[in-house]
């Protein structure tokens, strides 16, 4: 079975999503109210940040279990509104390098109310991962730098370990969730799919599948959206248009959510498997160190600011030099 790499090149994706009858789709189960997945992604209703023990019922009104029993509800404000990246530094995001169709991201609130502000941030450097002796992982990964600091969200920390098998430990990592805005479908009890929406109209979210294979730098999650798993009652599978969409994991020992990886590929027609690139903290640290190099020249003990009336000035006799690459 061929594995597909999801490429959200927006113009091409729009044409494909509207003309092809066999394109792949985002997958959730039709047996529970679709609003669960919408609210989960927007931190609305029962799914406000920090909420726990959230009851889930099916469309018959029957209880099918409780979400977020072992972790507080995550705050999804770190995810871009198009769902293809997450904020991991004051002005850095993480996604996959084959996402060449986006030049910026938005962060902020949803809705048309004037108080629901959101702002766009242009990408000024893509920082695509390059494989060499000191960078041993797959190249389909990047940490773009934004034009300015993001003020609508605080960045989320990355997982510290690149060994994928680490994250199958349900005692230490009891919960995983994912979010995205790829083309939206539901699957019925007979495993037939039905279209709900095209891509990039809104985000949906839920718990991930369980971990299958793993190696250094990647993890594969597999399952069936019709069946709850150990993570919860709202499994969701990523698909076409979801490349770069983030997966998060709860570290019970540290008591906080971390970004675990970004979606790279899978079998979206069946909605049964997704492969993620593990978040690379060392790579981000390397990028930041290269972008910001500060040098102080201590020549005098005084610091006097003198304006020249022309929009510039001089500060004493020692300097501060940020280096921009």
Where on the chain are the PLM-derived regions?
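Chymotrypsin/trypsin-fold serine protease catalytic domain
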Residues: 141, 145-241, 263-268
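N-terminal carbohydrate-binding/catalytic regions of secreted carbohydrate-active enzymes
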Residues: 55-90, 94-108
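Short conserved beta-strand and strand-loop elements enriched in small hydrophobics
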Residues: 101-117, 172-180, 249
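C-terminal subregion of chymotrypsin/trypsin-like serine protease catalytic domains
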Residues: 26-57, 83-99, 202-325
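Bacterial N-terminal signal peptides that target proteins for export
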Residues: 2-11
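Conserved catalytic-core segment of clan PA serine endopeptidases
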Residues: 31-38, 105-168
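Cleavable N-terminal signal peptides
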Residues: 12-13, 23-24
